[in-house]
C-alpha cells in the first residue's frame, strides 16, 4: 500500500442497505480496511459527524475518506465486507 499513498485524498459515498453488514453496527465494531476514515454520515436531511460510537443505520450514506491511490482497492474491499452476513463475524 505504501507506494499508492501520494498525499491526495479521495472521498466517496457508501450507502448502508438493509441487508448490509454495516447496518446496526457501531463504526468502531467494523474491521475497516487500512487507511479508511468514515468522516460523516448523511442521515435523511442531516449530516452527522461520525465517531466510533456512531451506530450506522439502514438508509445512511457514509462519507468515506481514503488515499486516492488506494480508492479502487478500498472500494472493492468495502463491497466484499458489506456482503458479509451479521452472523459471519
Question: Positions of the model-derived regions?
Answer:
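Cytosolic Rossmann-like ligand/nucleotide-binding regulatory domains
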Residues: 13-77
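Membrane-interfacial segments at transmembrane helix termini in multi-pass membrane proteins
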Residues: 1-10, 75, 80-88
Amino acid at each position: 500500500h505504501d507506494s499508492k499513498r501520494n498525499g491526495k485524498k479521495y472521498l466517496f459515498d457508501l450507502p448502508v442497505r438493509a441487508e448490509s453488514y454495516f447496518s446496526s453496527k457501531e463504526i468502531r465494531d467494523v474491521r475497516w480496511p487500512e487507511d479508511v476514515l468514515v468522516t460523516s454520515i448523511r442521515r435523511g436531511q442531516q449530516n452527522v459527524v461520525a465517531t466510533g460510537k456512531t451506530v450506522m443505520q439502514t438508509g445512511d450514506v457514509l462519507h468515506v475518506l481514503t488515499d486516492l491511490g488506494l480508492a479502487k482497492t478500498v472500494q472493492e474491499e468495502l463491497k466484499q465486507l458489506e456482503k458479509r452476513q451479521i452472523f459471519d463475524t
